[in-house]
């Protein structure tokens, strides 16, 4: 089994990366393969609503989103991590997720997702809430911990070690991800599959 961990920080080796590496270690100890995918400064644009991905399964903007689309089907679960910028996820993370879920939602459907939010101080819960909108739109089980998935540090990744509760929460999140993956795998072996819906019902608020 494999978990793909997305780093939405512009700082490749910063605090968000340290949080993901902490979770990766916990997952690896439980025989879960991991890969950290750096989003950072590689996003070249926002979703334009052109619909091009509906025809090709790829975004017309050729950047790290298409790189992610090439590998998301290989993963059994996902962790989406972001720093907090003005009480929101990073702009690059939002642009990345908008396009990733628009083009590749079917490859991630029914697979568990976890969120991790890293900040110097405030704005964590509102950033966490924004990140939740993506997996909960896509029929993905959301992995929770013993507290909201928040850890604190500023610039220096070593500061993350000072937030003992935050690290414990991230560890719990990773342990629960491993447990959920094993549960899903056991269910599949027992012949239990998701109830696939052939066609959604679409209505507009304005008639």
Regions found by a protein language model. Give the residues of each.
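A short beta-strand-loop structural module common to alpha/beta enzyme folds
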Residues: 32-42
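Short, hinge-like loop/turn segments at secondary-structure boundaries
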Residues: 51-55, 132, 161-162
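N-terminal beta1-alpha1 ligand-phosphate binding loop
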Residues: 2-30
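Helix-loop-strand module that forms the ligand-binding subsite of alpha/beta enzymes
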Residues: 60-147
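Cysteine-cluster motifs in flexible loop/terminal segments that predominantly coordinate metals
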Residues: 42-69, 199-207
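Glycine-rich phosphate/pyrophosphate-binding loop and the adjoining helix
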Residues: 141-207
């Amino acid at each position: 089994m494999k978990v793909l961990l997305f780093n939405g920080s512009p700082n490749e080796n910063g605090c968000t990366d340290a949080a993901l590496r902490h979770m990766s270690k916990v997952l690896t100890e439980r025989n879960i393969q991991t890969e950290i995918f750096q989003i950072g400064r590689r996003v070249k644009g926002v979703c334009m609503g052109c619909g091009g991905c509906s025809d090709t399964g790829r975004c017309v903007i050729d950047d790290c989103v298409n790189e992610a689309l090439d590998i998301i089907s290989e993963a059994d679960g996902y962790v989406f991590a972001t720093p907090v910028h003005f009480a929101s996820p990073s702009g690059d993370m939002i642009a990345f997720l908008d396009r990733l879920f628009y083009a590749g939602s079917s490859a991630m459907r029914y697979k568990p997702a976890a969120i991790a939010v890293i900040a110097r101080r405030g704005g964590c819960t509102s950033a966490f809430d924004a990140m939740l909108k993506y997996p909960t739109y896509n029929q993905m089980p959301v992995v929770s911990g013993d507290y909201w998935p928040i850890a604190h540090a500023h610039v220096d990744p070593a500061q993350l070690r000072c937030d003992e509760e935050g690290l414990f929460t991230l560890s719990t999140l990773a342990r629960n991800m491993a447990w959920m993956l094993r549960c899903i795998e056991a269910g599949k072996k027992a012949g239990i599959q998701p109830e696939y819906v052939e066609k959604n019902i679409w209505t507009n608020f304005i008639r």
